[in-house]
């Protein structure tokens, strides 16, 4: 048996055992609940977080279990009726695991590959089902969150109330998206009940953070509610010269004059300071990562400022029609310096030659989505018909400069090296707009739900590149248009089992041109066949899902060596096939658990010479995880205590598309312990202490993607003291 499979078996068994035990425990609890209900007419249930799922894709959840969301259909739809693999990271999971990045937030979701670039606080780069979704798959409140080059919006987990995940091609509703699917980040919204929280944190690498979250009615007379969330952090990291400082503020207001009308304003501003590079030097002789920081602590600042403001409006016209409109304006500016050691000096092998650079990028985007929902019957058929039109306009500007820097001294690799100011060499300006119109009908007959949807998009992109030394200008204009669709069928049994089958497509316009042919790139297209089952155990807060999928992507972009440089070419085709299973529960006995396993086989069907028939780099066949959190009984000796623990398995993978070397498999462990001081005395009610650790055993192995090697992020421990009143 292959080594990686042998190492995987214990965790797979643990995941499957946890899933089986979960079903047995939940079934037993359901039987007890039925007995209690029959005996006294009442039963104990978990508190349900019910929010309006018609706007922004917010989640209705009970503990760890997502029940419904608008992410899968743009209308509030139960997960059991969504004919596609969908899951969620709920607000309770965020509280228990206290993630500090989006990657940590998503680490326990099935099929999500985080850590492919090791420790790197600059970007939230991740993959799903073998496809990169960093640029194409991140949405905010059901609206596209654009990104370009290094201008990728940073996402603060403390500003989220959850994440909805729709896997697979999803252009039928959302337009330009990739083959892997989309991750909808749900912003914290005003609550009708008063909420007050302040928190201080201290952690590894001199990490200091203070944060607050206030919400409730503005006054007792007006139907206006507010929320104000913010934090301030001063922190170093495991890499010298790479801080992780952040200031974040997010105001929100909701006006609800009647039950049929609602307007929510969502805003945010943040400033983040980190490093221009965080990578380790790769020895060209071996191609592997060393322990030497490849950057320059004296020339490695990266400051990113971003802001957004938008609204969600919903108005019920009558018993049949509801109108919604969501819109957002967002801006991002990143100013960074970087210095990178790339090879031994010819005269002194203890020195490493370096190259330095600087860039200034600005991204501005406007997104608006208008939709009309109608619910009506035609005979025995119940319809939820959705018609909409959305528009995205973005402008991206980049100034880039390259220069020289002193060599890195391997005998003192953390010493800063002075770098002279670097002038900008090129200026790139890109303007893009996308207009899409879509129609979807969810048709219900008895236990059957047929979902049929289609969309047509028009995209126009103009790119101007100026060589500032010669003042020469290159202009590329391209226009794309494409139809996307989805059809799916779901059957719901009386006992909570819901098998489904679906077919969906996606398209993604590509900016730039092929330097070999001087022709614009065609859009990247993908299609998926998926079959699965979802099981919501009766009278138990437990959801188990499983899916089989096949995804074909064509006209993908690849880097290919031509002469002494790499250029983008388009002649690729990828195929991803796999299986996923996930289980989530939050039981009345204080136990919450999430477990998942994903098998993914991603191959290059067409691509650069030497890669055809190979596996995509850093795409493991096996990913599995288990996280459990238990709150001890209030009347027992451990009253007030909560403990949690998790394990994340990442199977072996190839380090490049040529498949000449491999990344080893690894298991990373996380842990949590908390204490509620109200167990000592009621006068301490609302005061809680929590300590979270990620990569508990500090495993920091090399991980290589696209031929370049990084290192896993090491152990971090964060203590939090929280007070709610």
Regions found by a protein language model. Give the residues of each.
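Gram-negative outer-membrane beta-barrel transporters
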Residues: 447, 550, 570-656, 700
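Membrane-embedded beta-barrel scaffold of Gram-negative outer-membrane proteins
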Residues: 314-316, 320-328, 332-340, 523-586, ...
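Structural signature of Gram-negative outer-membrane beta-barrels, strongest in the C-terminal barrel
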Residues: 254-258, 268, 363, 382-386, ...
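Face-selective signature of the C-terminal outer-membrane beta-barrel domain
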Residues: 309-332, 355-466
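Acidic/polar loop-and-plug regions of large Gram-negative outer-membrane beta-barrel proteins
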Residues: 233-237, 249-316, 329-363, 402-434, ...
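Conserved C-terminal beta-signal and adjacent last beta-strands/turns
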Residues: 6, 384-385, 529, 617-725
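Outer-membrane beta-barrel translocator/receptor signature
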Residues: 158-161, 167, 172-251, 257-261, ...
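Acidic, small-polar-rich N-terminal luminal/periplasmic segments of exported/outer-membrane proteins
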Residues: 21, 47-194, 198, 506, ...
């Amino acid at each position: 048996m292959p080594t990686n499979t042998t190492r995987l078996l214990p965790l797979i068994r643990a995941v499957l055992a946890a899933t089986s035990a979960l079903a047995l425990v939940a079934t037993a609890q359901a039987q007890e609940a039925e007995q209690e209900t029959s005996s006294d007419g009442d039963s104990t249930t978990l508190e349900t977080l019910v929010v309006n799922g018609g706007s922004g894709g917010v989640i209705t959840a009970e503990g760890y279990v997502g029940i419904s969301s608008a992410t899968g259909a743009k209308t509030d739809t139960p997960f059991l009726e969504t004919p596609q693999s969908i899951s969620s990271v709920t607000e309770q999971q965020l509280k228990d695991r206290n993630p500090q990045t989006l990657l940590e937030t998503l680490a326990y979701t099935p099929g999500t590959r985080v850590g492919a670039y090791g420790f790197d606080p600059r970007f939230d780069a991740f993959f799903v089902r073998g496809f990169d979704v960093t640029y194409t798959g991140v949405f905010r409140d059901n609206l596209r969150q654009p990104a370009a080059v290094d201008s990728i919006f940073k996402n603060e987990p403390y500003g989220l109330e959850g994440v909805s995940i729709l896997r697979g091609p999803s252009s039928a509703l959302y337009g330009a998206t990739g083959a892997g699917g989309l991750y909808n980040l749900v912003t914290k919204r005003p609550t009708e009940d008063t909420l007050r929280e302040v928190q201080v944190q201290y952690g590894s690498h001199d990490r200091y953070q203070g944060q607050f979250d206030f919400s409730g009615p503005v006054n007792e007379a007006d139907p206006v509610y507010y929320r104000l969330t913010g934090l301030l952090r001063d922190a170093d990291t495991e890499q010298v010269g790479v801080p992780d400082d952040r200031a974040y503020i997010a105001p929100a207001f909701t006006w609800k004059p009647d039950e049929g009308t609602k307007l929510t304003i969502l805003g945010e501003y943040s400033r983040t300071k980190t490093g221009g590079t965080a990578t380790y030097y790769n020895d060209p002789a071996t191609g592997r990562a060393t322990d030497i920081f490849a950057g320059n602590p004296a020339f490695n600042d990266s400051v990113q400022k971003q802001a957004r403001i938008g609204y969600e409006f919903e108005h019920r016209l009558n018993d049949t029609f509801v109108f919604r409109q969501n819109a957002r304006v967002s801006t991002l500016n990143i100013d960074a310096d970087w210095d990178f050691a790339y090879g031994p000096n010819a005269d002194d092998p203890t020195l490493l030659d370096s190259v330095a650079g600087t860039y200034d990028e600005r991204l501005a985007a406007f997104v608006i989505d208008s939709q009309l929902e109608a619910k009506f019957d035609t005979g025995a058929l119940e319809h939820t018909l959705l018609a909409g039109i959305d528009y995205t306009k973005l402008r991206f500007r980049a100034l880039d400069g390259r220069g020289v820097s002193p060599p890195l001294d391997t005998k003192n690799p953390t010493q800063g090296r002075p770098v002279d100011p670097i002038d900008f060499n090129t200026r790139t300006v890109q303007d893009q707009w996308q207009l899409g119109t879509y129609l979807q009908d969810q048709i219900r007959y008895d236990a059957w739900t047929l979902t049929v949807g289609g969309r047509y998009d028009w995209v126009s992109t103009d790119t101007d590149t100026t060589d500032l030394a010669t003042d020469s200008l290159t202009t590329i204009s391209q226009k794309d248009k494409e139809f996307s669709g989805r059809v799916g069928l779901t059957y719901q049994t009386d006992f909570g089992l819901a098998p489904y089958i679906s077919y969906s497509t996606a398209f993604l316009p590509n900016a730039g041109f092929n330097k070999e042919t001087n022709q614009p790139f065609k859009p990247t297209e993908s299609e998926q066949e998926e079959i699965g089952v979802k099981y919501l155990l009766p009278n138990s807060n437990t959801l188990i899902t499983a899916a089989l999928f096949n995804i074909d992507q064509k006209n993908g972009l690849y880097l290919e060596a031509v002469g002494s440089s790499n250029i983008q070419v388009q002649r690729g085709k990828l195929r991803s096939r796999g299986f996923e299973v996930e289980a989530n529960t939050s039981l009345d006995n204080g136990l919450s658990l999430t477990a998942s396993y994903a098998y993914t086989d991603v191959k290059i069907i067409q691509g650069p010479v030497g890669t055809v028939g190979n596996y995509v780099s850093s795409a493991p066949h096996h990913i599995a995880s288990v996280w459990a959190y238990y709150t001890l009984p209030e009347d027992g000796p451990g009253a007030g205590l909560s403990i949690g623990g998790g394990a994340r398995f990442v199977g072996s993978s190839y380090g490049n598309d040529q498949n000449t070397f491999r990344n080893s498999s690894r298991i990373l462990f996380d842990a949590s312990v908390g204490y509620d001081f109200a167990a000592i005395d009621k006068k301490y009610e609302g005061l809680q202490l929590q300590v979270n650790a990620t990569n508990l055993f500090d495993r920091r192995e090399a991980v290589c993607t696209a031929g370049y090697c990084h290192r896993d992020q090491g152990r971090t421990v964060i203590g939090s003291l929280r007070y709610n009143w």
